Amino acid sequence: MVDKRESYTKTDLEASGRGELFGAGGPPLPSGNMLMMDRVIKMTEDGGSHNKGYVEAELDINPDLWFFACHFVGDPVMPGCLGLDAMWQLVGFYLGWLGGEGKGRALGVGEVKFTGQVLPTAKKVTYRIHFKRVINRKLIMGLADGEVLVDGKLIYTANDLKVGLFKDTSAF
């Protein structure tokens, strides 16, 4: 049974990483340091730029986050690939929220632009995912556009984020 709410806490997201939120067949989020959000504040089946679904989530920033110590020494910045991964994570989370089953895998992105950075002095990163299409056949796949904001300023955009859910990933 899918635990379908409009918002989720960090505890809920950690439960997803253990496979407890969307049931045994639902796609888990990454756990530990690779979980790139602290809360989901909005999920809808409509809304967003394309009126086909919307997710908004947040990550609290503090100088003690693991990546600031190593990327880069003396010039700490959140790796842009982690923001991109967060957007893929949210596409997969949405597919599980809709009742999709399987293991989530990022399938690509059409275009990514970085126009800013996340520094340890920032307070909050906001992720916004605007769904364009969800395919629910043998393959369950989400197609979406995403935005990353730091303290309200748009710093990354991604067009055509693709995530699929797979029952068997052995041949992937």
From Swiss-Prot:
EC number of this enzyme: 4.2.1.59, 5.3.3.14
Active site per the UniProt annotation: 71
Gene3D superfamilies (UniProt xref): Hotdog Thioesterase
GO molecular function, one term: (3R)-hydroxyacyl-[acyl-carrier-protein] dehydratase activity
Keywords (A to Z) from UniProt: Cytoplasm, Fatty acid biosynthesis, Fatty acid metabolism, Isomerase, Lipid biosynthesis, Lipid metabolism, Lyase
Pathway: Lipid metabolism; fatty acid biosynthesis
Subcellular localization, as worded in the UniProt entry: Cytoplasm
Main location: cytoplasm
GO cellular component: cytoplasm
NCBIfam families to which the protein is assigned, alphabetical: fabA, PRK05174.1
Protein family (similarity comment): Belongs to the thioester dehydratase family. FabA subfamily.
General function of this protein: Necessary for the introduction of cis unsaturation into fatty acids. Catalyzes the dehydration of (3R)-3-hydroxydecanoyl-ACP to E-(2)-decenoyl-ACP and then its isomerization to Z-(3)-decenoyl-ACP. Can catalyze the dehydratase reaction for beta-hydroxyacyl-ACPs with saturated chain lengths up to 16:0, being most active on intermediate chain length.
Complexes and interactors: Homodimer.
Listed name of the protein: 3-hydroxydecanoyl-[acyl-carrier-protein] dehydratase
Species assigned in the record: Edwardsiella ictaluri (strain 93-146)
